[in-house]
């Protein structure tokens, strides 16, 4: 019996080994569970079989604590609802007829003038109230230091000054008295005559040089000045 059971276990291990062990060449493909529609089976009425009551001793089963299954919250994408534009409803203007209100004429009420007699009010003389002089302690005010204000340098544009033409100043001619120089009598120096041989110079013919006629300028350098204002 033991050998038969061991043989059966070996055969089952050999048959189930490719299904139980991991196959790295052909990994298992996940197939989602298929839900088959329930097949209606009519109830089969079997005759009641008498089974004597079997009294089994009570078996203690500890309570099975299942870990809580985490279900992530399902986030539904927001559904876009386009704004509904209602067409404007035309409401005709309601014209109320004008209500006529007749003018109310009130009769004039005569009010006689009220003459009040003059009331004499004697002058009230108040005694002088003495107010002692109030001496306030001096309030210390710290000196206020103002930060220096930056003033950028002011660049003045150059002022054009036209050239000033001064009129010529008349200077009268200075007449110096003549200085008398007595004649200097030098003794005659005798120079013997030097006889130079005559040097022949061929006549040089110069071309005529054109000289334009020289005339004075039509106006003087300075305008004539009147000597009477000096």
From Swiss-Prot:
GO terms for cellular component: extracellular region. InterPro entries: Adhesive_plaq (IPR002964), Extensin-like (IPR003883), Proline-rich_CW_protein (IPR051308). Belongs to the plant proline-rich protein superfamily. ENOD12 family. It holds the Pfam family Extensin_1. GO terms for molecular function: structural constituent of cell wall. Its main location: secreted. It is found in: Secreted, Cell wall. Keywords: Cell wall, Developmental protein, Repeat, Secreted, Signal. This is a developmentally regulated putative cell wall protein. PANTHER family: PROLINE-RICH EXTENSIN-LIKE PROTEIN EPR1, REPETITIVE PROLINE-RICH CELL WALL PROTEIN 3. The lineage of its organism: Eukaryota, Viridiplantae, Streptophyta, Embryophyta, Tracheophyta. Residues 78-223 have a biased composition (Pro residues). This is Repetitive proline-rich cell wall protein 2. Residues 1-22 form the signal peptide. The keyword Repeat applies. Residues 27-226 are annotated as: 40 X 5 AA approximate tandem repeats of P-P-[VTIY]-[EYGP]-[KN]. Residues 78-230 are annotated as: Disordered. Sequence repeats lie at residues 27-31, 32-36, 37-41, 42-46, 47-51, 52-56, 57-61, 62-66, 67-71, 72-76, 77-81, 82-86, 87-91, 92-96, 97-101, 102-106, 107-111, 112-116, 117-121, 122-126, 127-131, 132-136, 137-141, 142-146, 147-151, 152-156, 157-161, 162-166, 167-171, 172-176, 177-181, 182-186, 187-191, 192-196, 197-201, 202-206, 207-211, 212-216, 217-221, 222-226. It comes from Glycine max.
């Amino acid at each position: 019996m033991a050998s038969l059971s061991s043989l059966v276990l070996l055969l089952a291990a050999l048959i189930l080994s490719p299904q139980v062990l991991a196959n790295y060449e052909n990994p298992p493909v996940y197939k989602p569970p298929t839900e088959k529609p329930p097949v209606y089976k009519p109830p089969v009425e079997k005759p009641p079989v008498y089974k004597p009551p079997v009294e089994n001793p009570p078996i203690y089963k500890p309570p099975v604590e299942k870990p809580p299954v985490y279900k992530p919250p399902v986030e539904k994408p927001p559904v876009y609802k386009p704004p509904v534009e209602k067409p404007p409803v035309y409401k005709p203007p309601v014209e109320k007829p004008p209500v006529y209100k007749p003018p109310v004429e009130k009769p004039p009420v005569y009010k006689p003038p009220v003459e009040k007699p003059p009331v004499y009010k004697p002058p009230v003389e108040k005694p002088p109230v003495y107010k002692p002089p109030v001496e306030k302690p001096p309030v210390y005010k710290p000196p206020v230091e103002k930060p220096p204000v930056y003033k950028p340098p002011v660049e003045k544009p150059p002022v054009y000054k036209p050239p000033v033409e001064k009129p010529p100043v008349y200077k009268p001619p200075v007449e110096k008295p003549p200085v008398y120089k007595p004649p200097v009598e030098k003794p005659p120096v005798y120079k013997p005559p030097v006889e130079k041989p005559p040097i022949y110079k061929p006549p040089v013919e110069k071309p005529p040089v054109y000289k334009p006629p020289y005339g004075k300028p039509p106006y003087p350098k300075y305008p004539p000045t009147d000597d009477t204002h000096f």
